Each structure stands twice: as C-alpha cells, then as structure tokens.
C-alpha cells in the first residue's frame, strides 16, 4: 500500500549573532528569549514542497533500520489505533475497556507513543535520503540528533561534504498547526547544536533539519521541515 507524505518546508538561515545566541542560550535563559525574538522576527513561513509516495514495505524497512524504538510492528499498532477512530461497536457484554464510540466525545485510550516515534523516525530517514538526497552516515542511539547524513556523492568526498543533522518529532491525529508550534519550541535546540557542530568542523557546511511528522490516516501523513543553515 502506498503512503502519501505531504511536505512543507521552511528555510531558517542564521546570522553569526543568532548562532552565538543559540549556543549561549543553552546555559543562559535570558539569551534564549533573545534568540526566540530574533527567530520570530524573520517571519519565515512553511511553503508547500510537493509530496512523497512511499511503499509501506519501504517504510517498514526504514523503521526497522533507523528507529531506536523497540516496538514490534509499529505500523500495525498505528493501524489498530486508527481503526478504532471509526464508528465501531463491540458486542454487548465486553468489558468497558473494549467498548468505544467516537460519538461519546471521550477517548479512553491513546496511541502508543513509541510506535508513533518509530514510524516518524522511519519517515525522517526516507526524507533525508529522498528529499535531501543525502546518504545516512549514522543513527545515534539515545542521543541528539536522530540522524546524520552527508551530501557526498562518493566516499572520497565524505570529509569535505555538507552534513545534515536531523531531529524528528512525531504525532498522530493532531493538526499540522499544532506540530508547527511544537517545532517552534524545538528549533532552538537544533540551532544550538548545529552552530556548535559548525564550530567544530568549520571546513564543511552544516545543515540542521527539524522534521515534524503528523500521521493523519494509515496512508496519509504530513511532514514539516525546518532547515537551519549558517
């Protein structure tokens, strides 16, 4: 089954002053407020960037290969949760835990956050390879960011090519506007990390990529990308 991922992108170039604010704000809250004001003043909006068609088998492999979540059949768990969002009724006599009606206005269960994270990380890996045209070098475990990729076309160019530092956030059945707010709160951390990485490797370009994945249905996702450049 093909999955359609609608893309929106936002470019966020940082000046040297803004990069310094991001690094300093990791330990000084006053600088964090200055950084937030500087970013808000840029008025950069998300722009439509087309859509990706990804086969479910490809996404499942990407989840298995690049997610740090120990979740058996993450896609299956998402599908099960979404199936209960339709008008669906169990036979009388079942325990209340298994009785659900979307009309009641009360949701007594929630989707597995680990499954959402796993699927989102798999989507992030697909985007890094197919949208950014990068090769994945490393998947840090229990560390930041989620994925590191290179724009190198061959092995001989790895030491000088552009590096992509990708962090992925995910949610299920929430609005795109809510994800935009989440990314606005998270972009500071990625900006600080990207600026610090650039100081350590001044000879190559660093690009921080913050991805927000929204799972609407089993075959329709949205992905918001903020690209931090220096």
Feature-to-residue mapping (PLM):
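Catalytic cores of nucleic-acid endonucleases
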Residues: 170-230
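Interdomain/boundary linker segments immediately adjacent to catalytic/signaling cores
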Residues: 41-118
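N-terminal alpha-helical "arm" segments
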Residues: 1-46
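Conserved alpha/beta core surface patches that mediate binding of polyanionic ligands
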Residues: 140-152
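Eukaryote-skewed repeat-based solenoidal scaffolds used as protein-protein interaction platforms
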Residues: 129, 146-149, 167, 181-184
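Conserved catalytic cores of phosphodiester-cleaving nucleases, focusing on short active-site segments
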Residues: 147-149, 156-174
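Acidic-basic catalytic patches of nuclease active cores, encompassing PD-(D/E)XK
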Residues: 101-141, 195-203
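Short beta-turn/strand-loop junction motif enriched in small, turn-promoting residues
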Residues: 133-134, 152-155
């Amino acid at each position: 089954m093909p999955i359609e991922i609608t893309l929106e992108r936002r470019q966020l170039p940082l000046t040297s002053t803004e990069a310094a604010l991001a690094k300093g704000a990791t330990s000084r809250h006053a600088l964090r407020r200055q950084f937030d004001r500087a970013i808000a003043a840029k008025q950069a909006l998300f722009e439509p960037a087309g859509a990706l068609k990804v086969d479910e088998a490809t996404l499942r492999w990407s989840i298995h290969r690049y997610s740090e979540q120990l979740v058996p059949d993450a896609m299956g768990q998402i599908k099960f949760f979404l199936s209960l969002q339709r008008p669906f009724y169990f036979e009388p006599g079942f325990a209340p835990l298994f009785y659900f009606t979307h009309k009641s206005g009360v949701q007594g269960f929630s989707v597995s956050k680990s499954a959402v994270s796993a699927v989102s990380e798999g989507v992030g890996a697909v985007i890094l390879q197919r949208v950014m045209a990068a090769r994945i070098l490393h998947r840090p475990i229990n560390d930041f960011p989620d994925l590191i990729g290179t724009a190198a076309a061959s092995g001989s160019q790895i030491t000088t090519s552009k590096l992509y530092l990708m962090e992925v956030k995910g949610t299920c059945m929430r609005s795109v506007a809510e994800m935009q707010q989440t990314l606005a709160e998270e972009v500071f951390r990625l900006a600080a990390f990207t600026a610090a990485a650039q100081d350590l490797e001044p000879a190559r370009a660093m690009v921080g990529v913050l991805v927000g994945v929204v799972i609407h249905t089993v075959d329709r996702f949205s992905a918001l990308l903020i690209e931090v450049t220096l």
